[in-house]
From Swiss-Prot:
It comes from Kluyveromyces lactis (strain ATCC 8585 / CBS 2359 / DSM 70799 / NBRC 1267 / NRRL Y-1140 / WM37) (Yeast). One of its GO terms (cellular component) is mitochondrion. Coiled coil: none annotated. It comes from the Eukaryota. GO terms for biological process: regulation of translation. This is ATPase expression protein 2, mitochondrial. Belongs to the AEP2 family. GO terms for molecular function: RNA binding. The lineage of its organism: Eukaryota, Fungi, Dikarya, Ascomycota, Saccharomycotina.
Length: 518
């Protein structure tokens, strides 16, 4: 079914991939935080744990009472979450607590985390909860227990979210240790976690000098209030398995019926990311063609007979554009994305997908070879056309608009900026005496200042006045824009050095509800 490539060469097929201590990574960490500090930080934010979840019926014990924060406070008060003391407390409790009770408790805490990340965003706390789980639950149940497999995968996901890759891998090694012959269990989530941990399918960890340069340039062009929403990704060491081991896994997933029947869009998106990481572009193209009937020559075909048909989603298309972008082929990537949109018009593409697409189009844009910015323009128009096709207005997204503004500023294209204001901001702001869209307002002010400054620099003062009259969102905004226009057209006497400083930062020095934000 699949042609040979460097990935699918002629290779032996022993056991899938066994646990090994060689899967190790180091991570750059901040100053150590004690468990007690972490717990106190959490608990100080909570006055009453019952405000988080209200039980619907009487409960049998504290761990399953649907008040996980209250239970966490109790354990911290009794044992400070020390593994031996907590395990002993649970084991000999008068409530006769079971491993299942602790599993419920941990999953309730994870649910709290998913709803309010800042509340439980403490690695030390989760590390203690995991080690308690390992002793109180894993050691007490049989190998291959479905509950344990699910929970351990949840711990892996948690430590990935907390940027603790070594600990996530340690948890996964426990999964392999408890599985038959040390093989990866035939379980979708476990396979997906393996792809993330060991096969490069965490594109957010693809930090290169190119990506760091991109973020530094972006922050430089968006200095001020809006720059706070942009962060240079911290570097995390991310060693992955070699090509031969990846070959082995891929053949299992594609050709072994026991594994191929598990395919879903999440697994496909991770496989595509992994292929991008390993720079297997020929096989990447082949994979998309066989399983989705798409290729970069704008050819749309039926998927291969007998292959499980899946409808792509935002996550899968994010992986496609990231894989192509990572291999310096963003133009082909956007062509493939366009073919996906044509073949699968029922897809629901969310803002995170468009954010990723705009990001890669800018990151791979060479302003010296492509002075017109054809790649960023194509990505932007692709988004506009998509929303027009489905009959929806373009939704506001802070990062997308800041990416876009940095591009327009580099080209001094105020006409495109005016169109953006009409297409994106018009539906958000209603002219009132006091508009309260804070984040949107910050970005709109940046657009307004850029447009006004550019028009003044081109002696288009009449157009500038028209723009101010049309796009003032309230009295305060209008008064500020008029004052800014007067400053530009009637400059005060100042030194050349001071003028330079003002030019660098005045795009983001504006009032918000009477306050100067810097």
């Amino acid at each position: 079914m699949l042609k040979k490539s460097r990935v699918l060469g002629k290779i032996p097929i022993p056991y899938l991939i066994k646990g090994s201590s060689c899967f190790y990574s180091t991570v750059v960490t901040s100053a150590p935080i004690t468990l007690e500090d972490s717990l106190q930080s959490i608990l100080s934010d909570i006055q009453d744990g019952s405000n988080i979840v209200t039980p619907n019926k009487p409960n049998t014990n504290l761990l399953t009472s649907k008040q996980p924060i209250k239970a966490l406070k109790h354990l911290q008060w009794k044992t400070n979450l020390r593994v031996k003391k907590t395990t002993r407390l649970l084991k000999y409790s008068n409530e006769k607590l079971t491993p299942e009770d602790y599993s419920v408790f941990v999953n309730q805490l994870m649910d709290v985390y998913s709803k309010d990340i800042e509340l439980l965003n403490k690695t030390e706390v989760w590390k203690s909860l995991y080690h308690i789980y390992r002793v109180f639950v894993v050691n007490a149940v049989d190998d291959g227990n479905a509950m344990v497999l699910y929970d351990l995968n949840q711990f892996v996901r948690m430590f990935i979210n907390l940027n603790d890759l070594p600990l996530a891998r340690n948890v996964f090694q426990l999964i392999l240790k408890n599985s038959k012959n040390g093989e990866i269990p035939k379980d979708v989530q476990t396979i997906c976690m393996y792809l993330r941990l060991y096969c490069g399918a965490l594109s957010e960890l693809w930090t290169t000098q190119t990506s760091r340069n991109f973020y530094q340039d972006l922050i430089g062009s968006l200095s001020g209030s809006n720059a706070s929403s942009i962060r240079i990704p911290s570097h995390i060491a991310y060693p992955t398995i070699g090509v031969p081991q990846f070959q082995l896994l891929l053949r299992k997933l594609v050709e072994d019926p026991e594994y191929s029947k598990l395919r879903n869009t999440e697994m496909d998106s991770l496989i595509i990311q992994a292929l991008g990481h390993y720079k297997e572009v020929p096989f990447l193209k082949q994979y998309i063609s066989i399983f989705y009937g798409i290729d970069e020559n704008v050819t749309i075909t039926e998927t291969h007979p007998g292959i499980k048909k899946l409808t792509p989603d935002s996550q899968l298309l994010k992986s496609v554009i990231s894989a192509y972008g990572h291999n310096n082929n963003i133009t082909s990537g956007m062509t493939v994305i366009g073919s996906f949109m044509e073949k699968y018009p029922e897809m629901n593409l969310d803002k995170s997908f468009w954010r990723t697409t705009i990001y890669w189009s800018l990151r791979e844009w060479n302003k010296y070879k492509d002075s017109k910015g054809s790649q960023p323009k194509k990505a932007w128009n692709l988004m506009l056309n998509w929303y027009a096709t489905i009959g929806k207005a373009v939704p506001f997204d802070q990062k997308i608009m800041l990416y876009r503004l940095s591009f327009l500023k580099s080209r001094k294209d105020h006409n495109a900026a005016i169109r953006d204001v009409q297409q994106v901001f018009k539906r958000i702001f209603i002219k009132t005496e006091k508009n309260t869209f804070i984040v949107e307002r910050l970005v709109l002010y940046a657009y307004q200042r850029f447009i006004i400054k550019n028009l003044v620099n081109q002696n288009e003062n009449a157009k500038c006045v028209d723009f101010i009259n049309e796009w003032r969102i309230d009295f305060e905004n209008g008064r500020y824009l008029e004052r800014y226009f007067k400053e530009l057209t009637h400059p005060k006497n100042e030194s050349d050095e001071q003028k330079k400083l003002n030019d660098e930062d005045d795009d983001y020095n504006f009032p918000l509800f009477g306050t100067n934000i810097l």
